[in-house]
Amino acid sequence: MKIAIITDQHLDGRKGSAAFWAFFKKFYDEIFFPTLEREGITTVLDLGDTFDNRKSLDYNTLARIKTDYFDRLKAYDVHMILGNHTTYYKNSSHINSPELLLEQYDNIKIYSEPYELSFGSKNFLLLPWINGANQEVSEEMIQKSNADICCGHLEIDGFEVTPGMHFQGGRAIKDFKRFDRVWSGHFHHRSKKGNVQYLGNPYQMFWNDYKDPRGFHIYDTETDRLTWKKNPFEIFTKIYYNDVEKSYHNFDYNEHKDTFVKIIVEEKRDYAQYETLLDNLYHVGVHDVKTVETLVDTDDSDSDIEVKDTLTLLNEYIDDVDIAVDKTDLKRLMQTLYIESCEVV
C-alpha cells in the first residue's frame, strides 16, 4: 500500500494572497494530484497546519481552497492531525479550524488526540500538536505505543527550523527511540537525525525559504520505502546586478515571471540600464521587486571578524545582561518571537 504524506500546507498562508495561492495551486495541479493518480494512491496523511491563521479566514480565500483543493480531495481517504496553526487556543485543541471548516467532507478524518491505526502492514501512532489538554495522554502513548511509525506535529530539540537556525527546547530525540521511524511536520525545513525526520512543507512561503528544496512524500508500507517528490517551482528569485561585468540588454526576464525578485546590487554605473531592468521585470509580470545595495570596502583589516546569526547574538546578550528572570525561559521566548518574525515579509 502506498500513502501520500504532506504537511504544513498553510493553505490560507500569506494572508490569503492571490499570488501565493496561484503558486500553491500550481503545485497541486501539476505535481501533487497527478502524482497521486499516477501512483494509484488513495490515502493521504496530513501532518498538521493545513490552515495558517489560528483566528480567522476570509470567505473568498476559503472558497478557493475548497474548490481547488478539498473538492478534488474527495476521491481520497484523508487522515489529518492538528498542528499549532489550526488550534484557536494554545493550550487546547477543542476549537480548531479543520473541524469547523471541513465538516462537509466525509472523506476527511481529523485527529485532535493521539490515535493508533494501520496502513497496509505498518502500525502508526498519530500525534497531533501537544498542548495542555492532550499532554497526559500524549506522554502515555509516546512511552507505551507499539506502533512502527510515529507521525506528529512535534517540537524536537536540535532540529533546523530554517537552514542554519536550530530549535532549542522541546522534546529530546531519545523520547522516540521505541519507534522505527518518526515523521513530523511543524518545521518547514527538511532534516533528519537518527530515526527522526522532519518532512518539510510543500512549497516556499518566505524569503528564508529561498533555494530550500520543498515537496511531499510517498510511503510504501510493503517495501518500507519513503520517497520524496520534489516541488520544482520557486516563487523567490535573486538577481546579482553588476553592469561593469555584465550587460543586461539580452537578459532573460521570463524566468522571473510570477516571482518575488530581490536584486542584489554589486556594481551600478549605468543607471539607465538598471532602470530598464526594473521596468522589464514589472512588464514581464513579477509580483514585487526588492533592491539590496551592497557596500564594497577594499580595506580587508576586518577580514577576521566573526559573523554570528541573529539568534546567537540575542542569546549572548541575554547571557551577559543582569536580569532577575529565568534566562532559559527568556531565550525560548525570544526564539519563538524570532521564528514568528521570520514569517513576516
Which residues are covered by each model-predicted region?
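Accessory, non-catalytic peripheral segments of nucleic-acid enzymes
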Residues: 221-345
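Short, conserved loop/helix-junction motifs that constitute active-site signature segments
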Residues: 70-74, 141-145, 173-178, 254-256
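Active-site environment of divalent metal-dependent phosphoester hydrolases
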Residues: 10-14, 52-55, 81-92, 117-118, ...
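Conserved catalytic scaffold of divalent metal-dependent phosphoesterases
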Residues: 86-173
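Core catalytic region of metal-dependent phosphoesterases/phosphodiesterases
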Residues: 2, 9, 13-116, 175-179
